[in-house]
Amino acid sequence: LPTHETLPADHKAAIRQMKQALRAQIGDVQAVFDKLSARISERLQEIETLKAAGQEVWPTIPFRDIAEGTVSDEQRAAIKRRGCAVIKGHFPREQALAWDTAMLEYLDRNHFDDVYKGPGDSFFGSLEASRPEIYPIYWSPSQMQARQSDEMAAVQSFLNRLWRFEQNGKRWFDPDVSVIYPDRIRRRPPGTTSKGLGAHTDSGALERWLLPAYQQVFANVFNGNIDAYDPWDAAHRTEVEEYTVDNTTKCSVFRTFQGWT
């Protein structure tokens, strides 16, 4: 396949060439697409049935069960089926409220309302300029204390271990070692209806089409064997290096999950 380690000068032509090669490799593209569409429809119906019955759609895991190692195989399977989870009791309520208060004091102390000029990228362009729901603040004491807590490390290790991170003698990442990932503050006042985030897919689309590592990650998709594709297989994901382009929001870190605390 015509992969590219660096971004080609005419990346649009390169993607067209890749798509032609993939179509030839897959064969009956429509049949594969129809099969996947039917599978997605079945999953959506499953979710709608649960919602109508007032049952839980995404799994909720008490932090205590993670700390004590009592999360069941059924709960782990539910997280992998949904691709997300809610962890409750991660921090005491009093601690969370204290961090929230300290964060507001940090904003006031640094004159946030006077110096804030907008989100700085297109993901949050629809938010209000003053006191937004998502703040471009990364290193406040509240954020750092949460990131560096033992509780956070325990949850990250638990979630990382849901991935298939080692196979054939190769370890793709260490599930018990996480890099502190700085991200914004999200603070939604009661009654907020805005989702705060524009629709987007993290990591570059160019790379998904053209990088050799991504061709390995999605090999079973690109050869039409979608039944063999395991989205929890970390193989080759840590080999992905995004192209050097003028983009302020890119990052080479492999994030096993993304969440809000």
At which residue positions do the language-model features occur?
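Fe(II)/2-oxoglutarate
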Residues: 1-81
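Non-heme Fe(II) oxygenase catalytic core, chiefly the N-lobe of the double-stranded beta-helix
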Residues: 54, 74, 79-82, 91-261
